[in-house]
């Protein structure tokens, strides 16, 4: 949301801040009205009770549109919010290969919740101290986890060792 405000603050010129000798004016429905001076463009917008917004300052002549600025700003925010909403996030779940069954079930239910919400899940099995000697037990735990979430997810990145951790990434299955 802050990005939209920054863009509007620094790039969008409105009404009196538009100072060009001539501008191409477009009405609220997108039809070009013609080339006018900045003052004439502001007067056209004022007659309709709307604002004159600079759309493209790099064009020759610069392009301005007659809009209801409050509504226009709201639409931009709505589009930005919808774009953010559709992005999936990477959630991480950390486990140990020798954890108790209840703890494992809690992590499994968290992963299922994330996957149902459409997020990617990174499962990390942490190995401490001498546990590095029992890497096959950690791989077995990861295989068990993969089997348990196979109805909801598919493996995006197979289990790989990263230092003292064994991690894999799961993505939700397409319905």
Swiss-Prot record:
GO terms for molecular function: ribosome binding; translation initiation factor activity. It holds the Pfam family IF3_C. GO terms for cellular component: chloroplast; cytosol; membrane. One of its GO terms (biological process) is ribosome disassembly. Its main location: plastid. Keywords: Chloroplast, Initiation factor, Plastid, Protein biosynthesis. Coiled coil: none annotated. It is found in: Plastid, Chloroplast. Belongs to the IF-3 family. IF-3 binds to the 30S ribosomal subunit and shifts the equilibrium between 70S ribosomes and their 50S and 30S subunits in favor of the free subunits, thus enhancing the availability of 30S subunits on which protein synthesis initiation begins. Monomer. HAMAP family: IF_3. NCBIfam families: infC. This is Translation initiation factor IF-3, chloroplastic. It comes from Cyanidioschyzon merolae (strain NIES-3377 / 10D) (Unicellular red alga).
